[in-house]
């Protein structure tokens, strides 16, 4: 397939927001420049993880506004469908003779399927899209030659790729010179969009988001302190761990030790012995799923019991097959939830498996969505690179087969990641934002210096649930809390009546914690929390709740499911025991 050109005939349609075929507009009403937007903080980074946040605004605060394009590409004549025989899109990816060729071929299949389905719906005014495939050899000179061929010789209307961060950087420079849009679904280098080149869109959350999410889970949520890094010795591993090391240092727990392995390695005993001797209480793997499976297997065989975490490329069926029971407990970040009940996702999986006899994984799925976004932009913008660029830059949200995407003004998908956890040989997924998981105890970090708090008594331990529809919610949550009793206190009744019942649950029944499900309930319950020394999780956006120097109030976003708040209470209680003060320390990420 060396430098092959694959042509897929038939016709095309944009899939409007990824939800169904509609006729391609063929640039009938090309969009103008996108509206000016501003989104702070950059990449949604929490304050305690942003560099120099205590001293000055980080340099990347300059990236919070829409990147302007003031060139002349929009002035080029619009090419009509009857003037072309095909609409070319360039593809750059490692599809042969490359360590990442398995990933590159899956990425190609996802992009290819999107084009085939678009062509089956009529093409661009009856003319088919054609994918011009070029192999990314991850050698700067060779890759740059392929990119130049696409932009100038083949005259593609847009480019797609690559996985390699260095090749993508080169492609971006060519796109600036040639004024050709480029979309990406696989490169995680956060510096790529920071070039302020206005021709780029990416759908995969970058290393910054992945690192901050892992750091939040490891340090703030689980309370681990001494982390060892085990990474692949290539650009993906080398660049990937930089942001995690930065986040670890900012949270007060610099990485204890960093070990490397060469691509293709299968024996990790030397690195694991060094990590074991270091006293690390957790391990982060930054690499691919195949080696990660061997690492887990060899760790457990050596008697190492530390929890293990990973970057998104750690997740894969081959890890489960290789590691077996040793994989249980692994947690890794992931862009979406492939186990969710979503008809759109299920239909895509069926179509993909029928076409390629294999289930789509992350590279194929994101490539399909990314190519769909590009096809929509071409249909809206027409055959004019400047207008295609405007259409891409104007994308703010998108619903695809992988779920919802939200793009910042820099055309990066910044939707929160998922945590994939292995349990009984299967992956379980849940959304996990990189913001402080329990907000903060006081916006400036309030401490508790009061008297010692007694343990809860014997029997099922009460947890108060206060807010609208409390009885209905408590009934739903009860099966999730064995050994505990979720006590509902409805807020729809008169406040005096609600307060009386809440006092009884807190003082007489000795509830271990409270969950207040809305703003009003949170404000009513906060005085009880401080007087009774009981931790309370408030589901509210009202910062005043955590700005009153009350060390018992913790805050989660108002849209948080009460089940998630309960889960966090139970997870913390499993480490703290039935003691309110110890529970509070665990909830805010204190020492285990």
What are the functions of these language-model segments?
Residues 1-8:
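Bacterial N-terminal signal peptides that target proteins for export
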Residues 10-12, 20-592:
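Extracytosolic ligand-binding ectodomains
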């Amino acid at each position: 397939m060396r430098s092959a050109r694959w042509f897929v005939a038939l016709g095309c349609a944009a899939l409007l927001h990824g939800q169904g075929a509609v006729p391609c507009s063929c640039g009938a009403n090309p969009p103008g420049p996108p509206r000016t937007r501003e989104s702070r903080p950059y990449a949604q980074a929490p304050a305690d993880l942003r560099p120099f946040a205590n001293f000055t605004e980080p340099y990347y605060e300059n990236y919070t506004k829409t990147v302007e394009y003031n060139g002349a590409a929009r002035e080029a004549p619009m090419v009509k469908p009857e003037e072309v025989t095909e609409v070319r899109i360039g593809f750059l990816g490692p599809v042969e003779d490359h360590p990442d060729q398995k990933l590159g071929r899956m990425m190609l299949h996802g992009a290819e399927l999107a084009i085939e389905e678009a062509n089956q719906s009529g093409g661009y005014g009856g003319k088919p899209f054609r994918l011009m495939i070029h192999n990314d050899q991850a050698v700067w000179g060779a890759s740059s030659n392929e990119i130049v061929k696409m932009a100038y010789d083949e005259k593609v209307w847009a480019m797609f790729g690559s996985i390699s961060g260095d090749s993508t950087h080169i492609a971006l420079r060519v796109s600036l010179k040639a004024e050709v849009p480029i979309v990406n679904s696989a490169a995680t280098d956060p510096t790529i969009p920071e070039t302020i080149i206005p021709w780029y869109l990416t759908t995969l959350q970058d290393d910054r988001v992945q690192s901050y999410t892992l750091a939040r889970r490891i340090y703030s949520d689980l309370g681990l302190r001494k982390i060892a890094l085990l990474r692949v010795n290539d650009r993906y591993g080398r660049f990937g761990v930089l942001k995690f090391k930065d986040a670890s240092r900012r949270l007060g727990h610099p990485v204890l030790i960093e070990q490397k392995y060469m691509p293709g390695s299968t024996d990790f005993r030397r690195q694991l012995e060094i990590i074991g001797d270091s006293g690390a209480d957790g391990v982060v793997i930054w690499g691919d799923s195949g080696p990660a499976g061997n690492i887990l297997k060899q760790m457990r065989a050596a008697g190492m019991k530390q929890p293990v975490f990973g970057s998104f490329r750690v997740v894969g069926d081959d890890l489960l097959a290789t590691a077996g029971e040793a994989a249980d407990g692994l947690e890794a970040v992931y862009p979406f939830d492939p186990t969710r009940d979503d008809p759109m996702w299920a239909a895509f999986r069926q179509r993909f498996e029928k076409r390629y006899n294999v289930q789509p994984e992350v590279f194929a799925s994101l490539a399909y969505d990314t190519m769909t976004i590009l096809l929509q932009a071409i249909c809206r913008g027409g055959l004019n690179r400047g207008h295609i660029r405007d259409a891409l830059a104007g994308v703010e949200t998108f619903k695809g087969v992988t779920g919802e995407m939200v793009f910042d003004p820099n055309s990066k998908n910044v939707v929160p990641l998922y945590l994939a956890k292995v349990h009984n040989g299967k992956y379980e997924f849940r959304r996990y934002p990189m913001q402080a998981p329990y907000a903060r105890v006081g916006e400036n970090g309030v401490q508790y210096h009061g008297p010692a708090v007694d343990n809860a008594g014997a029997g099922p331990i009460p947890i108060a649930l206060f807010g609208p529809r409390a009885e209905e919610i408590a009934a739903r949550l009860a099966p999730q809390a064995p050994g505990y009793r979720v006590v509902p206190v409805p807020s729809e009744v008169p406040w005096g009546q609600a307060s009386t019942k809440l006092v009884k649950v807190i003082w007489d029944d000795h509830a271990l914690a409270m969950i207040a499900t809305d703003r009003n309930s949170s404000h009513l319950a906060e005085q009880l929390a401080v007087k009774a020394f009981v931790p309370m999780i408030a589901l509210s956006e009202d910062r005043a709740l955590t700005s009153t120097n009350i060390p018992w109030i913790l805050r989660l976003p108002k849209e948080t499911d009460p089940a998630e708040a309960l889960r966090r209470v139970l997870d913390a209680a499993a480490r703290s025991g039935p003691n309110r003060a110890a529970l509070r320390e665990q909830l805010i990420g204190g020492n285990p």
